[in-house]
């Protein structure tokens, strides 16, 4: 659920998916979005031999339909400098649909994805921890549900009018 560009770094998720498939994990990846990296990502999936495990959906407008098919939102951004500052809409949307997130900890994401509560925020490049987090959520659907609901509540709290006002005023009082 994002632009398919180098900052969103879906190519990193394809590498992780290959490792998961090689371990026999029951995984599929739905890539939602359009962008300059689409052809490269399709070629990478084919080169890795995982094209049967990856579906490229293009732009998705029906978020309800999309999230009915998604158990976990995986997110592998690679933000350098000021690129991609802040939390992506995909994480907010996952929260609204009670979907836990496994993500690299980049650009303030840890404010939304709290490891062990609303999903897992993994240090950038730690593929083993990323795989372990996904595996935990696959094996424990009740935990997946709890984390999804916790993310929903957290999104509602952080995006409330009162919280936006409070943080805006705090920024001006610095």
Name the predicted role of every residue range.
Residues 129-132, 136, 143-158, 164-170:
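A short, well-ordered alpha-helix in the C-terminal region of glycosyltransferases
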Residues 13-14, 29, 130, 168:
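A structural motif in glycosyltransferase catalytic domains
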Residues 68-83, 99-100:
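Acidic donor-binding loop of glycosyltransferase active sites
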Residues 64, 88-96, 110-111:
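Short alpha-helical segment that forms part of, or immediately flanks, the ligand-binding pocket
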Residues 37, 51-60, 66:
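Active-site donor-binding acidic/aromatic loop of nucleotide-activated sugar
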Residues 100-103, 113, 121:
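Short hydrophobic beta-strand element within catalytic cores of glycosyltransferases
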Residues 115-116, 120-127, 136-141:
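Conserved acidic donor-binding segment of nucleotide-sugar-dependent glycosyltransferases
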Residues 3-19, 36-42, 128:
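A conserved mid-protein helix/loop that constitutes part of the nucleotide-sugar donor-binding site
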């Amino acid at each position: 659920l994002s632009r398919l560009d180098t900052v969103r770094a879906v190519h990193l998720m394809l590498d992780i998916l290959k490792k998961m498939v090689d371990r026999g994990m029951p995984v599929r990846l739905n890539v939602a979005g359009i962008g300059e990296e689409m052809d490269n990502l399709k070629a990478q999936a084919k080169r890795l031999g995982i094209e049967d495990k990856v579906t490229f959906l293009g732009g998705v407008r029906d978020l309800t339909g999309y999230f009915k098919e998604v158990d976990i939102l995986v997110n592998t951004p690679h933000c350098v400098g000021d690129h991609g500052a802040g939390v992506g809409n995909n994480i907010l949307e996952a929260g609204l649909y009670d979907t836990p997130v496994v993500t690299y900890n980049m650009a303030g994401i840890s404010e939304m994805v709290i490891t062990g509560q609303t999903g897992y925020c993994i240090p950038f490049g730690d593929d083993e921890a990323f795989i372990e987090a996904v595996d935990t959520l696959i094996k424990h659907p009740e935990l997946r549900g709890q984390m999804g609901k916790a993310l929903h509540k957290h999104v509602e709290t952080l995006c409330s009018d009162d919280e936006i006002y409070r943080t805006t005023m705090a920024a001006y009082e610095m």
